[in-house]
């Protein structure tokens, strides 16, 4: 079976789950990866390299395989021996976006598919904060970031590492689906030094504390043109956010870093 990945990236783990297959599971499996530019014929264009060697499987069990490759993949191929059922295949990795698709454009700097990620978070009781950076719209509350009710002083927050050093010009904070549990307000801070994220003085305001509506998308133009590598979202005091979008463009330094990662993982 060949799977085209959701985004090109470096694979660090593969999960082969044989849940509920007790008498008809494969005896073993192996996984290979390939990099195919564009949308060509994978069967003829791909040069496959091993990610997971042939490994034994058991029935009704979740098997996690660590991958040590530093090469970028666009496709993976699962082989099972000799046959049988697999409930789920999960391929975990780090997205490596193509610089040719980002250079000179305004795009969502906080999107997982563009290489962004959540690097810190105050609460993940109900769901992962990474949900907010996923493609498309949230259909239910579980597809966004929902915090527990905060019973102590303070507020909930998270920090997003952007696709690269960039200037953010527009923010979207979407509370769709959160009616009785949306934040009352939110703010955004920016930081341009990845080594100073723990220093409060390194952060500067992008969006002041602003009231939010429940079950509604919000768009805010940002006037601060200083480059940032990380953005902190604060919600007051807690609540759910379906999607966070941060639109802008890479700086020259940010584009150079994206190019470097692209070359290092396969050119």
PLM region spans:
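Disordered, acidic Ser/Thr/Pro-rich linker "stalks" and the adjacent N-terminal cap
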Residues: 1-4, 94-163, 179-181, 250-267
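A short beta-strand element within beta-rich, extracytoplasmic domains
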Residues: 9-20, 78, 167-178, 233
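Predominantly extracellular/luminal cell-surface or secreted proteins
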Residues: 17, 32-36, 92, 174, ...
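Short, surface-exposed beta-strand/strand-loop-strand elements in extracellular ectodomains
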Residues: 22-37, 181-194
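Acidic Ser/Thr/Pro-rich low-complexity disordered segments
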Residues: 37-49, 103-108, 194-204, 262
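Beta-sandwich interaction modules
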Residues: 48-85, 155, 162, 166, ...
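Eukaryotic modular interaction domains in large regulatory/scaffold proteins
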Residues: 141-172, 177, 195-197, 202-218
